[in-house]
Amino acid sequence: MTKTKQEIYNKRPTSPHLTIYKPQISSTLSILYRMTGVALFFAVSILVWWLILSKYDNNYLQLAECCIIKICLVAVSYAWFYHLCNGIRHLFWDIGYGFSIKLVNITGWCVVVGSVLLTVLLWV
């Protein structure tokens, strides 16, 4: 007995949906690494534009005193430190070190704690 294409298609296994997976530190940090890379592209572009404008008009420089701008600068610096720390982690992976589950989890938490500490050290 021959099966039609539709019957074969209906019996194909489907991939599990993302909602059934428990988020792990490695997957969460991987997604955040990509997100911070994109966010930093735009943030640094805006920051450079702002610095160029502040050279010609001091009003732009005075914006740095605004609380919202300071919060944004802290967030950008955290994203930068996070991206830096996770990039160093990826460099170790590139040379073949740190692929055990235990080391992946330890280095993941080191990235999170390290980026927070570096941000605090910068702004305090």
UniProtKB/Swiss-Prot annotation:
Primary localization class, coarse: membrane
Key words of the record: Cell inner membrane, Cell membrane, Electron transport, Heme, Iron, Membrane, Metal-binding, Transmembrane, Transmembrane helix, Transport, Tricarboxylic acid cycle
Pfam families named in the record: Sdh_cyt (PF01127)
Binding site for heme: H83
Biological pathway: Carbohydrate metabolism; tricarboxylic acid cycle
Residues in the Cytoplasmic compartment per record: 1-29, 89-103
Localization annotation: Cell inner membrane
Membrane-traversing stretches: 30-55, 68-88, 104-124
NCBIfam families on file: succ_dehyd_cytB
Function: Membrane-anchoring subunit of succinate dehydrogenase (SDH).
Subunit structure: Part of an enzyme complex containing four subunits: a flavoprotein, an iron-sulfur protein, plus two membrane-anchoring proteins, SdhC and SdhD. The complex can form homotrimers.
Protein name as it appears in the record: Succinate dehydrogenase cytochrome b556 subunit
Originating organism: Rickettsia conorii (strain ATCC VR-613 / Malish 7)
Taxonomic lineage from the root: Bacteria, Pseudomonadati, Pseudomonadota, Alphaproteobacteria, Rickettsiales
